[in-house]
A protein has these predicted regions:
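Acidic, polar-rich low-complexity tracts and alpha-helical solenoid repeat scaffolds
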Residues: 1-161
Length: 161
């Protein structure tokens, strides 16, 4: 059913039908495939696809739906390969939507929970970039500047190559 909902542009309905499978059948043999489908639905929304209400009425793209679905992926399968990339995508969407708190949270979880992930170096750079975006000038609070410098230094120390 989720595939049909996705093709019709009913992305949240697709996610909810996939969530039903996850909740009712946690030992489902194709559990990773379900998580992959949830990830695909979120990435379609992140790509800017037009959602349709009731399958025929075009509506506005709501990127917070993508964040919600990515959070569901992390919650449902925290040890899967999808979790680190979902957290990175949450931070990218949050930064685009000018929501640095959500970006900080996602990047912090990525850095702390998945330090061996291939996305950990990018998470350090992204965290520094988000802090750098908060710098408003020399007359204002210097904490974002210091934090950006700290994350750039951490990146250089932890990932010298």
């Amino acid at each position: 059913m989720a595939v049909v909902y996705t093709k019709r542009g009913q992305f949240m309905d697709a996610y909810e039908s996939l969530q039903e499978v996850v909740k009712r059948y946690p030992d489902y043999p194709k559990f990773n495939q379900i998580i992959g489908e949830e990830y695909n639905v979120a990435s379609i929304i992140q790509g800017g696809a037009t959602p349709y209400l009731w399958g025929w009425f075009p509506w506005f793209t709501n990127y917070s739906d993508a964040i919600k679905i990515y959070e569901g992926v992390v919650k449902n399968a925290p040890y899967s390969d999808y979790a680190p990339i979902a957290l990175m995508n949450i931070s990218l969407i949050a930064e685009d939507e000018d929501n640095p708190e959500v970006a900080f949270d996602a990047l912090d979880r990525l850095i702390n929970n998945y330090p061996k992930s291939m996305f950990a170096p990018d998470a350090y750079m992204q965290m520094a970039k988000v802090y750098k975006g908060m710098v408003e000038g020399p007359e204002y609070d210097h904490a974002p500047t210091r934090n950006a410098i700290i994350f750039y230094q951490d990146y250089l120390i932890l990932f010298p190559k």
